[in-house]
A protein has these predicted regions:
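Gly/serine-rich nucleotide phosphate-binding loop at the start of the catalytic core
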Residues: 1-56
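Active-site-proximal, Lys/Arg-enriched surface segment
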Residues: 62-141
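An anionic, glycine-rich sequence signature occurring as long contiguous blocks
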Residues: 143, 209-314
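Domain-level cores of phosphate- or acyl-group-handling catalytic modules
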Residues: 152-221
Length: 367
């Protein structure tokens, strides 16, 4: 299967030696224990002399990683049959400051500033498995404004500052590669402005399901709330007002491999400064009158159950990243080259796809 996938995703590489090195590197990512460095891969394949050649292939060669990603995306379109594209941000801690994109960044999930790279991946996902396809580096001011002498050069089109810019650009590009009707984009970007997110994906013609803070200001529309004065209120407060509409929805937890049940309710809303009809979806998991999580989506005609299960695909991706991506070297690139980071990440994404396709089905879903 590895040779077949290599023939597919490397078909557009112009030189046979590039295709051969691509397969060698991919084999190393799948078989080397520990850190997946170029040195360790070269040693494992039994050709220490290949280290310099592989280093050049990743960090200094001219092959276009987007060509390989596009082929990988089309492969996953057939093999995964994704229900959505899922955005997955990744924080990669770094000790130094000279690797591309590295800088001090506040990480909300950790509650502290971390010297790190911040990457955003877009994944093809269904309920059973998922695989990364397209990637962006989210760059801080130091990289976008005036990189210091000796810093890696970043092409201007890649100078995205926010997770939203990275996510939207990568998702639109991926959809263009695979074609067909636009798939929903599932996002959980705590620092993204919900109104800006809605406008960005509306402009791209791509539906979305986005986790939002309970403090998000929304305005109910239509007859859903009798007696409401039509002014904006918080998402949490509005969902609490419609909690009597809740229905039970089942979904599969990809971590525990068990069937879970949540109570959900939805209400048509608008965001400040927008007129596009949206649905605000809330999830309750206990007896509390306040929702545990909430999402906004422009899939206003989709029933609440399928909408919640779309949102839960982010858990599928998180589980696969932890169990598979970290084991095939996704965060192991040690070089300073912008192109090197993208080429390594592209090949690690292919290694992830192979691993997931051949893991026992019982690990992907309960019997």
């Amino acid at each position: 299967m590895l040779s077949e996938l290599c023939a597919e995703i490397f078909a557009q590489l112009p030189r046979s030696d590039q295709r051969r090195k691509g397969e060698m590197y991919l084999r190393g990512l799948l078989s080397v224990g520990g850190r997946k460095s170029v040195r360790n891969i070269a040693t494992h394949v039994g050709d220490r002399a290949a280290e310099q050649s592989l280093h050049h292939f990743i960090s200094a060669s001219t092959w276009d990683w987007n060509t390989v990603r596009a082929a990988l995306g089309r492969h996953l379109e057939r093999s995964v049959r994704p229900r959505a594209w899922v955005v997955h941000p990744v924080v990669i801690p770094k000790a130094g400051r000279h690797s591309v994109g590295v800088g001090p960044r506040f990480v909300p999930s950790l509650g502290q500033v971390v010297n790190s790279q911040h990457a955003v991946g877009v994944w093809a996902a269904n309920d059973e498995r998922s695989g990364p396809v397209n990637w962006r580096l989210s760059l801080g001011d130091d990289w976008r404004d005036a990189p210091l002498p000796g810093y890696p050069q970043v092409p201007e089109p890649e100078l995205a500052a926010t997770d939203l810019e990275c996510a939207a650009g990568a998702a639109v590009e991926l959809q263009g590669w695979v074609g067909g009707p636009p798939r929903p984009v599932v996002l959980d970007l705590p620092q993204a402005d919900p109104a800006a997110l809605a406008r960005r994906f509306a402009a791209a013609g791509m539906p979305f399901v986005a986790a939002v803070p309970g403090s998000t200001r929304v305005t109910p529309v239509g007859p859903a709330l009798v007696g409401h004065d039509g002014r904006g209120t918080s998402a949490h407060q509005l969902l609490r007002m419609v909690r009597t509409l809740r229905r039970a929805v089942t979904w599969t937890d990809p971590v525990t491999l068990t069937t879970r049940t949540s109570l959900v309710a939805g209400i048509p809303v608008q965001l400040p400064g927008t007129r596009r009809p949206l649905v605000l979806l809330g999830e309750w998991t206990g007896k509390d009158s306040w929702p545990r999580r909430c999402w906004l989506s422009d899939l206003a005609d989709t029933p609440w159950g399928p909408l919640l299960r779309l949102a839960k695909l982010s858990l599928r991706v998180g589980a696969d990243f932890a169990a598979v991506s970290t084991q095939v070297g996704m965060v192991d690139f040690e070089g300073r080259s912008f192109g090197g980071w993208h080429r390594h990440t592209t090949l690690a994404s292919a290694a992830h796809a192979l691993t997931v396709e051949y893991r026992p089905r019982a690990l992907a879903r309960p019997a």
